[in-house]
């Protein structure tokens, strides 16, 4: 018997059960927004991509040393489909898992997870504190300064671009567009 695809409400409840950090919740919402945008752009299942984006860091706050492994256990216990579990685990490829992203969904999650952090940090240093007026060239300018958002592993983003066969500028633009759709929820609407 195949597990039923989880509804967004189920993912949201699970996320909030394991996370109290406002910044982690906002990160999950940002990744969900970008995943939904990318699914629409590529004619994929927006609900599935969004739910996977929302739940991808489920275990990070409580179990940072077991990131992805603990999420696998939790999702299995909750009867999530294997496809969803594999996608979530694959975003930690080369960091905390050896599950390589294979599908477009998995490659996208892998590529944009770190990138959302760079976009947020870039937006927050701008006068508007918003993604609504943010352009890819501003993010690329900050990209070059390795001290800026030093916690963002740019090599993961570059590997993700290679996996997807897209240029960095295109991925940045798509990430910004997806984040604009959830700008209110992630606190980056600003005054723009």
Where are these regions (language model features)?
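Acidic/His-rich, divalent-metal-binding segments that scaffold phosphate/diphosphate chemistry
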Residues: 1-63
């Amino acid at each position: 018997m195949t597990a039923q695809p989880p509804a967004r409400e189920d993912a949201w409840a699970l996320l909030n059960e394991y996370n109290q950090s406002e910044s982690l919740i906002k990160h999950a919402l940002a990744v969900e927004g970008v995943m939904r945008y990318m699914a629409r752009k590529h004619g994929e299942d927006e609900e599935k991509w969004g739910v996977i984006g929302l739940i991808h860091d489920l275990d990070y706050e409580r179990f940072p040393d077991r990131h992805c492994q603990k999420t696998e256990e939790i999702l299995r216990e909750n009867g999530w489909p294997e496809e969803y579990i594999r996608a979530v685990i694959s975003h930690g490829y080369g960091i905390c898992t050896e599950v390589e992203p294979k599908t477009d969904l998995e490659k996208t999650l892998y590529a944009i997870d770190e990138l959302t952090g760079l976009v947020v940090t870039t937006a927050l240093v701008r006068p508007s504190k918003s993604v609504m007026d943010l352009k890819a060239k501003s993010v690329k300018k900050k990209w070059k300064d390795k001290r800026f958002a030093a916690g963002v592993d740019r090599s993961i983003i570059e590997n993700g671009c290679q996996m997807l066969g897209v240029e960095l500028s295109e991925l940045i633009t798509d990430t910004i567009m997806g984040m604009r759709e959830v700008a209110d929820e992630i606190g980056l609407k600003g005054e723009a």
